[in-house]
Amino acid sequence: MELKTMPQNGANNGNPQGNTSNNNNTNDSSNSNSNNNNKTERTNWSNGLEFLMSCISVSVGLGNIWRFPFTAYENGGGAFLIPYIIVLFMIGKPMYYLEMIMGQFTSQGTVKIWSICPSFLGVGYGQAFGTICIISYYSSLLALTLYYLAVSFQADLPWSTCRDTWINCVNSRPAEYIETMMTNGSSALTRATDTPAKLQSSSELYFLDVVINEKTDISDGVGNPDWKLTIALFVSWIVIFLVIMRGVKSSGKAAYFLALFPYVVLFTLLGRAVTLEGAVDGIIFFLEPQWGELLNPTVWKEAVVQCFFSLAVGSGPIIMFSSYNRFDHPIYRDAMIVTTLDTLTSLLGGITIFAILGNLAHNLKVENIRDVVRSGTGLAFISYPDAISKFNAVPQLFSALFFFMLFVLGIGSIVALQSTIVTIICDQFKWKYWKVALVTSICGFLMGLVYVTPGGQWILTLVDFYGGTYVVFILAIFELVGIAWIYGVSNFCDDIEFMSNKRVSLYWRACWLIFTPIMMIVIFIYSMVTITPIKYSDIYFPVAGDVAGWLLFAIGASQFPLWGWWYVHNHRTGSIAKSFVDSLKPSQKWGPADPETRRNWLLFKSDLAAKRAVQAKSDKMGFFRQKLYNMCGRST
């Protein structure tokens, strides 16, 4: 995006009105300006709308159109929807708003924000590891999308009709549902009533047999990369590199297109999907609540993970984007807009997919929509193409538009994730941005090769489950604990009040302090205790696969204690115990980056501490009220 360099400004913070606070984060206030002798300048967005559109482009992406439908499909449709909405309000929105605040308040990236609690430095590096895992397989989805985009320009969509070698195949093309291709290559008109084997649509068989050449067993290896998908993967990474090589300076104007164009295609597909026969049954399956599933912890765990993926929480892009805001930018408004629009987009994608699944169930004579197609990451590459093949007018055009849209969404998601990694590296080593972008893009391409093999979908499922799910989940818990429980909600809310000149509502305080961390901890512990061996398409992974998955999780999660130990060991202030306690306190680098804003902030915090100390002494119940305040951040 087009940026302009300027010093950051505070927000009417000379004498802001507000509550009083225990100033436990200013243990180094006497030396607060030692690191700020020179005026710090920070590039800012040229306008707030570009920031908003950029957040929409990363949050409203593959997580909504690709991951949400198959996650809902695997968890019972309406059985998943209710927990997802609850999780959104109790976990998703609070975490999203918190990360926006952290980035804007400090003007720092995912790792350097942990000057707030230095021993939690490993949270930032662990999240970077989880982000790398996500990037590795997201790029393979771009390769699949690019492949489908290329074949969409053929005279006939290649997945719309059955091939001679496909048994029990039903054409996806309209008016040909009952034409089943037999093993001898002859075509016969049959009715599904007497067919003993399960019928499969031509779009599903095309994806499994032609595009990914799926292996049903990886005990002997995953196979060699497919040359067509390898080329598509290479082209995808070239595009990614070209976008990120100049950082955020050139992507602002594109954010308008990246954020708005997908809705045109989505509404077009929705309009066609809801008019198909059986679509109502699919939509009802998606929207009808199944209250009994509220007691299923697996559904809650999947709702949390999907919320993180959809909003890009716990992986760094939100912190990175908001770090380029002016200090007084109204992020509360933007956080509410993005999280609400993200949910509506997920519902839009879900209704579209399940309308198509309802139509497939009708055509394949299947009573249970869960049995229509195999679940998994390929669902979007089966259901959407099947719907497009039913367009009466120029389906090739709609196919090209849809997969171009999916490619754009993928680029928006990966660019944000990849930029997070590049920013972390550049912040640490001060290397040239384009060189880091080039090297990381090459590494991303090499990692992505494993996903374009016949066993690639197995690896994708494994990495998504252990690296993209549990690593992100547990580190998000540590992130919230470090900010809300160790730094303290009261201190955090004081910082927000200083930045926005507004008091923080009880809803946010209660979520950050109680509801969000407790819900996340309970769901995570229960999901770990009741975890079952991972499967792909109802087939269990070999033992080596499970071992590799747990090793992946261990590498990501271990970043937290390892970097914590490193910080304590290298910043000894006495005994190990004293050094550990000191490592839980904010360092001298914590606070606003602009020196003038930082001085005002320190005066603001000091004034609050003095006022609260006076109140505590003058009130017999002051001591207990102060303790209560420190817990929940409410005014005494």
UniProtKB/Swiss-Prot annotation:
<dbReference type="GO" id="GO:0089718">
    <property type="term" value="P:amino acid import across plasma membrane"/>
</dbReference>
<keyword id="KW-0769">Symport</keyword>
<comment type="similarity">
    <text>Belongs to the sodium:neurotransmitter symporter (SNF) (TC 2.A.22) family.</text>
</comment>
<feature type="transmembrane region" description="Helical; Name=6">
    <location>
        <begin position="303"/>
        <end position="323"/>
    </location>
</feature>
<keyword id="KW-0812">Transmembrane</keyword>
<keyword id="KW-0406">Ion transport</keyword>
<keyword id="KW-0915">Sodium</keyword>
<feature type="transmembrane region" description="Helical; Name=3">
    <location>
        <begin position="131"/>
        <end position="151"/>
    </location>
</feature>
<dbReference type="GO" id="GO:0005283">
    <property type="term" value="F:amino acid:sodium symporter activity"/>
</dbReference>
<dbReference type="GO" id="GO:0042943">
    <property type="term" value="F:D-amino acid transmembrane transporter activity"/>
</dbReference>
<feature type="transmembrane region" description="Helical; Name=4">
    <location>
        <begin position="225"/>
        <end position="245"/>
    </location>
</feature>
<keyword id="KW-0739">Sodium transport</keyword>
<feature type="transmembrane region" description="Helical; Name=10">
    <location>
        <begin position="469"/>
        <end position="489"/>
    </location>
</feature>
<feature type="transmembrane region" description="Helical; Name=2">
    <location>
        <begin position="78"/>
        <end position="98"/>
    </location>
</feature>
<dbReference type="Pfam" id="PF00209">
    <property type="entry name" value="SNF"/>
</dbReference>
<keyword id="KW-0472">Membrane</keyword>
<dbReference type="GO" id="GO:0006814">
    <property type="term" value="P:sodium ion transport"/>
</dbReference>
<dbReference type="GO" id="GO:0042940">
    <property type="term" value="P:D-amino acid transport"/>
</dbReference>
<feature type="topological domain" description="Cytoplasmic">
    <location>
        <begin position="1"/>
        <end position="50"/>
    </location>
</feature>
<protein>
    <recommendedName>
        <fullName>Sodium-dependent nutrient amino acid transporter 1</fullName>
    </recommendedName>
</protein>
<feature type="transmembrane region" description="Helical; Name=1">
    <location>
        <begin position="51"/>
        <end position="71"/>
    </location>
</feature>
<dbReference type="GO" id="GO:0015804">
    <property type="term" value="P:neutral amino acid transport"/>
</dbReference>
<feature type="transmembrane region" description="Helical; Name=12">
    <location>
        <begin position="547"/>
        <end position="567"/>
    </location>
</feature>
<keyword id="KW-1133">Transmembrane helix</keyword>
<dbReference type="InterPro" id="IPR037272">
    <property type="entry name" value="SNS_sf"/>
</dbReference>
<dbReference type="InterPro" id="IPR000175">
    <property type="entry name" value="Na/ntran_symport"/>
</dbReference>
<dbReference type="GO" id="GO:0015175">
    <property type="term" value="F:neutral L-amino acid transmembrane transporter activity"/>
</dbReference>
<comment type="function">
    <text>Unusual broad substrate spectrum amino acid:sodium cotransporter that promotes absorption of the D isomers of essential amino acids. Neutral amino acids are the preferred substrates, especially methionine and phenylalanine.</text>
</comment>
<keyword id="KW-0029">Amino-acid transport</keyword>
<feature type="transmembrane region" description="Helical; Name=11">
    <location>
        <begin position="511"/>
        <end position="531"/>
    </location>
</feature>
<dbReference type="GO" id="GO:0005886">
    <property type="term" value="C:plasma membrane"/>
</dbReference>
<feature type="transmembrane region" description="Helical; Name=8">
    <location>
        <begin position="397"/>
        <end position="417"/>
    </location>
</feature>
<feature type="compositionally biased region" description="Low complexity">
    <location>
        <begin position="7"/>
        <end position="40"/>
    </location>
</feature>
<feature type="transmembrane region" description="Helical; Name=5">
    <location>
        <begin position="254"/>
        <end position="274"/>
    </location>
</feature>
<feature type="transmembrane region" description="Helical; Name=9">
    <location>
        <begin position="436"/>
        <end position="456"/>
    </location>
</feature>
<keyword id="KW-0325">Glycoprotein</keyword>
<feature type="transmembrane region" description="Helical; Name=7">
    <location>
        <begin position="337"/>
        <end position="357"/>
    </location>
</feature>
<feature type="glycosylation site" description="N-linked (GlcNAc...) asparagine">
    <location>
        <position position="184"/>
    </location>
</feature>
<dbReference type="GO" id="GO:0015179">
    <property type="term" value="F:L-amino acid transmembrane transporter activity"/>
</dbReference>
<keyword id="KW-0813">Transport</keyword>
<feature type="region of interest" description="Disordered">
    <location>
        <begin position="1"/>
        <end position="40"/>
    </location>
</feature>
